[in-house]
Every structure is written in C-alpha cells, then in structure tokens.
C-alpha cells in the first residue's frame, strides 16, 4: 500500500495515498481499534448536508469565498450521493463529542474540494478547519447532524412503514368483521368479540404510536448549530445558526429551526430520549401484535389455530410440515433490541456534564439502529405475514361453542352466583353450557337460546 504524509498539530502521520481523509481521521483510526460498529453513514450524510449549508451561509455572510463555497458544496453533494462512503472508516467508540467524525467529514470535503479546484486550474486551497469547519465546533455540529439524521430516519422510514402495516390491518378489520370468536384475558377464555374487533385494537395501537412519534420528532428539529464550543456562539456570526438551519430545511424538505437555547442543545439530548421513547412505545405494541399473531396461529392441531399465517419457509430441520411464525419471531427480536437501545440512550443522555454531553456517538448509533430495524421489521412482517393472514372459521366457531364464558350473558338474568354455578357444573361434568343451564332449572331452553347468543354479546346494549 502506498502512503502520503499528512500533518496536524501533533506532527506527521502516514495516510493511505488513495484515501481522502487526513491526519486526524488516521489518528482516530489507529487510536480506537474498538469493535466493528462504524459511525452510521446517515450521520456522515447529515454532516455533509450541514457542511454544505454552513459553507453557503458563510459565503452569504462574506466570510468564505464563492470559489471555496462552491467546491465545498460539490464535495458535500458527492458524499450525500454515497460516492465516498469508503472514506468514512471511523467507529462509534471514539471521543464522546464525535470530534473525530466531524474532522473526518471536514478532511474528506477539504481534500475532495481541493481536487475539484485543481481540476479547474485554481491554486486556492481549502482547509478542513479554517474553511469547512468555519464558524463551527464539533460540539454543535455533531448534535446538529444527529438531529438531522434521526429526523430523516423517522420521517422517511419509520412512519411510512407504520402506515403500510396500518393499511393492511384496516383491510383485515373489514374482512373479519363478521367472524365471532372467543375473547381471552389472562390467557383464559373470556366473552366473545369479532376477529375484526380484535385486530382493530392492533390498528389503533399503530395510529396512536404513529402520532406520538411524529409529535416527539418535532422537538428534534431544533438544531444546535451556532452554539460552537460551549453554547455562546464564539467565532460564529449571530445569524449563522438561523441561516444554516434554513439551508438545511431547504435541502431536506423538513422544517428545522435554530435551537433557542444553545447551552441546552449542547449538553442535553432529552429530545432524542423522548423520540426514542415513542419508538419504544411502538416496539411494545409490535411485541403484543406479533405475539398475538403467533399464538392465534399456534397448532395446527394442538394449539389455538384460529388464524392461518403464510408458510414462508420450512419450519423445522427435523420435524416435517411445521409452519413456524418466523416473521413474528424476527419482529419480537427487533423489539428486544430496541428496548436495550432505549436503556443505552437514556443513560447516555444523562451524562451531560457541565456544558457538553460526551456520549453523542453511542446515542446516534443506537437511535438510528432502532429506527431502521423497526422500519425494516415492520415492512417484512407486513409483506410476509400480515397481508396473508386468514381466519380458520371452523376452529373459531368450535372454540366459541365450547367456551363456558358465554355464561356471562346470563348474569343480568339469573345473577352472578347462579351463572358461576352453571359454568362450574358444566366444566366438572363435561357438559355443554346449555346442558348445565337446563339441569339447573333456572332457565328454559327457549330462554337460554335467546340470551346466550354470541351475536348479541359483541357490543353494548341498552
């Protein structure tokens, strides 16, 4: 491998000749050989959006030449397009402010910008700190990139995935609205409802968590840029934060604003905790939905078997003919990961000592992992399971007819204690509910048939 010599305030260091990064990135690469978790490319691209916006703002403020600004913008656009992904090698486990990743972006943009200028015959030189990082600090750029990346992940991936599954469940609510099944509480038989009603509960969960996520996401549209080192805005123009936020809004199509209090923006990540909490609420609901699906599909002969799920692959390497609820299992594992990520984010966000939180990279990594896992898992569950759910009406009807909990309909007519005696007698003697009721002498067959009708038990009545 061929190398070139780069220099920084610590001296000289060898850098691979074919890479666009420079000394500080190389030092980080050598000093932090920890794990395999690379800084998410979403953060890199959010940084590129920020650097592009900063260059244009500094140009408008008369602090950066048009020639340099144009080269920085072109280089940043290439990063956003994914052209230089392999030039961002740093892991998450670095300085807690994300300084090395900020400098990685600065160095790549500077070196690529200089290539662009050289191709045009210019002898102007772009400096990673003086030009690309002008009016900025890692302390305000990383939280800005964090918020931009998280907002885009939620609005471009998570929310559309929820909408997709919501639409599928809405179709199932209508398709199954006529199928009366036995309800279950505490994993025990309860009073009847329709399969459509049961699934409508799942649909409502997604409606609510979708709104929670969208609402919480608005708080992350406040950006730290303009706060520089400790929130005072030293070395930045007073209008810089607002101007950059406007540029970012224009490029992303999302309405970002300059955070009104930069001291808060640098040291606290409560907005990320709040939004990830909404993602955790979604995850909790998805766990419930996935579990209901796999339990309702259990069997086929020794389980509940009330719904049929698609057979996507052989279920067992030793037992032929099994159809396992693999999509539910994958989704519930994602939920477990999201729950763990939430604990990490909550603790990391509590570590804002004095003017700066120094757990930023791990917050970014875990939030973006949660967002993308949830989005991917929801789409997979929808496409490979939910759309293909069918009802086994024969088993559902059999379970309703066998249930002793239909006795609940007798409560207003013969009282709770008498109804309980009938249910216990039927269970003990192996009788149907009707047989036990008639033996009690409290009801005629005509009265029983009129009262104990599952169709009359699925909604309130006057």
Curated annotation (Swiss-Prot):
Principal cellular location given in the protein's record: cytoplasm
CDD domains documented for this protein: Fumarase_classII
Class of this enzyme: lyase
Repeat as UniProt keyword: no
GO molecular function list: fumarate hydratase activity
Keyword entries, A-Z: Cytoplasm, Lyase, Tricarboxylic acid cycle
Catalytic reactions on record: (S)-malate = fumarate + H2O
Site (described: Important for catalytic activity): 329
Gene3D superfamilies for the chain: Fumarase/aspartase (C-terminal domain), Fumarase/aspartase (Central domain), Fumarase/aspartase (N-terminal domain)
A Pfam match: Lyase_1
Biological process annotations from GO: fumarate metabolic process; malate metabolic process; tricarboxylic acid cycle
Family: Belongs to the class-II fumarase/aspartase family. Fumarase subfamily.
Assembly, per entry: Homotetramer.
Additional remark text: There are 2 substrate-binding sites: the catalytic A site, and the non-catalytic B site that may play a role in the transfer of substrate or product between the active site and the solvent. Alternatively, the B site may bind allosteric effectors.
Protein name: Fumarate hydratase class II
Species of provenance: Bacillus anthracis
